[in-house]
Amino acid sequence: MSIRRVVVLYGGISEERAVSLISGQQVVAALREAGYEVTPIEVGADLRDTIAALTPAPDVVFNALHGRFGEDGAIQGVLDWLNIPYTHSGVRASAIAMDKAAARTAFLAAGLPVAEGRLVTVEELAEQDPLPRPFVIKPANEGSAVGVHILHEGDNRRTEIARSWSFGGQALVEEYIPGRELTVGVLNDRALTVTDIRPRSAFYDYESKYAEGGSRHILPAQMHPDAFKRALDVALAAHHALGCRGATRSDFRYDDTRAEPGRLVLLEVNTQPGLTPTSLLPEQAALMGMDFVSLCRWMVEQATCRA
């Protein structure tokens, strides 16, 4: 199949809309530089408008959406129904990866290292600590560190967090893993490298991820070689455990305060890695010899094998 016409979907209706707008603009420019005929479609709340904009059908849809509707299997199902090839993972992998509790179950079944944790109701959270402190509270279905809180000893925000919770009736709570934030990009069957993320603040939050100068990225990460290889292996195994396709990015905590090689814990798999100027996957691809235009072209070419 000769690919000429590519639609880039960006924007969306999630908490991560602003990130998606930046990703989409970067992708549109890169694909035009690569020689494709590119049509950007800013996705809003009315699905009928999006479907109408996809008529006539393009050769490929580049999905640059993040969060709800963009990476939870919803838009993937629409594109499958329209029989249009699209980038990144399909319905099932996207839905499971976005549901952090379901992803945990899949990781455990595959024998991958995860933090101790469980789903709790907001009422349970309001009443008492669900785990020994310190622990992390996170939405079950959000990305980009949206809604994430860390509670240490002496922190009295738990009841306030529960009362103001706006991410459904449940939250995922997990033990807090001290140490370093790591990430590994995967392109199909290839784990790229390990990035050590050094946020300017104490926590790798939304601002640290996307603000200019919010974090420092060290790649390849300087760490015990056994742990480095383990991170690559686990990222690839997690990609396959969820049935992902194309590009993903696996996030880890690495507790190097323990005896070597330290404790590596898988946090999540991102099926729609960010493609902003400060994003991690493009940096890793560049280190491996693939510039941003080539990365976007690769993603489009990977979409040709399915519809």
Swiss-Prot record:
Task: Spell out the molecular function terms from Gene Ontology.
Answer: ATP binding; D-alanine-D-alanine ligase activity; metal ion binding
Domain called ATP-grasp: residue spans: 104-301
Enumerate the residues binding Mg(2+) 1. D251, E268
Q: Where in the cell is it found?
A: Cytoplasm
The domain of life for this entry's organism is Bacteria
Q: How is the cofactor bound?
A: Binds 2 magnesium or manganese ions per subunit.
Q: Name one GO biological process term.
A: cell wall organization
Per UniProt, where does ATP bind?
130-183
EC number(s) on record? 6.3.2.4
Entry's Gene Ontology cellular component terms:
cytoplasm
Task: Name any cofactors this protein relies on.
Answer: Mg(2+); Mn(2+)
Give one Pfam family, short name only.
Answer: Dala_Dala_lig_C
InterPro entries (UniProt xref):
ATP-grasp, ATP_grasp_subdomain_1, D-Ala_lig_Van_CS, D_ala_D_ala, Dala_Dala_lig_C, Dala_Dala_lig_N, PreATP-grasp_dom_sf
Query: What family does this belong to?
Result: Belongs to the D-alanine--D-alanine ligase family.
Q: What is this protein called?
A: D-alanine--D-alanine ligase
Recorded name of the encoding gene: ddl
